[in-house]
Every structure is written in structure tokens, then in C-alpha cells.
Amino acid sequence: MKRNEIDLLLTQIFSVLLKREVMTDEVIDRSSEPNWDSLLHLDLIMTVESEFNTQLSVDEIEKCISKDALAEILGEHIGADA
């Protein structure tokens, strides 16, 4: 899977969970997104693990503080191409 495919799928996931349109190049992080609370974070991780057919470690989950950070972690975790 290529990095842009990861970004596209994450954008779709964030759009569904945040209940608003999220742009692919939009910067989203926990500190600036009022709807990104602990429950949404759990939902996000479970959805990502299901959609990408992977399991993130506790350390990886703790580092998922933005859409870009999550994309980076997934890229490393599943061996994404550039």
C-alpha cells in the first residue's frame, strides 16, 4: 500500500468519525480538534486496525496524536511504499 492510499483511507475514516468532511491535506490533531476525545480515539484506533488489518502496539497508539502521525505509524507498520 502506498502512503497516498493510507492518507486517503485515513481521511475517509476521520470524515466518518468526526461527522464532517475532512480534506486529504487537512491537518488534524487531538489538541485542535474539539471532537477528538478519548472515546473517539478508541473508536479511531479500532477502526484503523480493522480497515488496515493490523494491530498497533500501546506505544504506537499513544503516538497517534494527529492524522499525519497515524499515517506515518501505519506506513512503518505495514511497510508502505512512498
Regions found by a protein language model. Give the residues of each.
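Generic signature of intrinsically disordered, low-complexity, basic-rich segments
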Residues: 11, 50, 65-67
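Phosphopantetheine carrier-protein modules
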Residues: 15-35, 51-63
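C-terminal structural segments of small proteins and small subunits
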Residues: 58, 62-81
